[in-house]
């Protein structure tokens, strides 16, 4: 499943295609959304916001299209009039004079009014987004030490969108490798230096990934600046200590780590 950096890149692509352009056609597959089609004709996308793995597509009339791709949803950008050859089921079409964005296969799609943005179950539950430029290491440190999260093992905590939105499995293992910790640690047990390093890594690594690499290809190491240090590298040498990277399972997900330098 794509993680925060890949979701933000998808949002960037959607914005680049249609932001600010009047919508000439709008189509929704779900009956409960049909009534909004006419309300959006002539409107434009003001911006596309990411909240973890959810996208919020905002319009000037106050409406916001909420979509969560879950496992199978995917957005595509096409030239207007082009009909992609695909077996996927179309859910949403937002068309402008020259570009059209299409959402396929997703099932979690809603139209929200301003007051619903603060009461929507997912948006209420999800934590601060790691790619939010206003989120600081100090705030992350406060969350790590809060009663809600300080007793949680990192193996599960770093996958919990209520802690920080946008983290996922490859970010989990890369962050813990960066700070030299295993997944069984808890924030309450860290010393000040470890806590500070973790708070910074929780923001720096997702932002570095977003800035310097594209979609995740779990079978290849990219030539971009960001590259995996341990993810999908079991059996290889750790570049930091020369130990052998191992693979196990933590919180029901594959976990990659180096026993030589992660303690």
Swiss-Prot record:
The active site is at residues 2-3, 53, 253. A zinc finger (FPG-type) spans 229-263. It catalyses: 2'-deoxyribonucleotide-(2'-deoxyribose 5'-phosphate)-2'-deoxyribonucleotide-DNA = a 3'-end 2'-deoxyribonucleotide-(2,3-dehydro-2,3-deoxyribose 5'-phosphate)-DNA + a 5'-end 5'-phospho-2'-deoxyribonucleoside-DNA + H(+). Its cofactor is Zn(2+). SUPFAM superfamilies: Glucocorticoid receptor-like (DNA-binding domain) (SSF57716), N-terminal domain of MutM-like DNA repair proteins (SSF81624), S13-like H2TH domain (SSF46946). It comes from the Bacteria. InterPro entries: DNA_glyclase/AP_lyase_DNA-bd, DNA_glyclase_Znf_dom_DNA_BS, EcNei-like_N, Endonuclease-VIII, FPG_cat, MutM-like_N-ter, Ribosomal_uS13-like_H2TH, Znf_DNA_glyclase/AP_lyase. Pfam families: Fapy_DNA_glyco, H2TH, zf-FPG_IleRS. Its EC number is 3.2.2.-, 4.2.99.18. Keywords: DNA damage, DNA repair, DNA-binding, Glycosidase, Hydrolase, Lyase, Metal-binding, Multifunctional enzyme, Zinc, Zinc-finger. GO terms for biological process: base-excision repair. The gene is nei. Gene3D superfamilies: 1.10.8.50, MutM-like, N-terminal. HAMAP family: Endonuclease_8 (MF_01253). This is Endonuclease 8. One of its GO terms (molecular function) is class I DNA-(apurinic or apyrimidinic site) endonuclease activity. PROSITE patterns: FPG_CAT (PS51068), ZF_FPG_1 (PS01242), ZF_FPG_2 (PS51066). Binds 1 zinc ion per subunit. Belongs to the FPG family. DNA binds at residues 70, 125, 169. Involved in base excision repair of DNA damaged by oxidation or by mutagenic agents. Acts as a DNA glycosylase that recognizes and removes damaged bases. Has a preference for oxidized pyrimidines, such as thymine glycol, 5,6-dihydrouracil and 5,6-dihydrothymine. Has AP (apurinic/apyrimidinic) lyase activity and introduces nicks in the DNA strand. Cleaves the DNA backbone by beta-delta elimination to generate a single-strand break at the site of the removed base with both 3'- and 5'-phosphates.
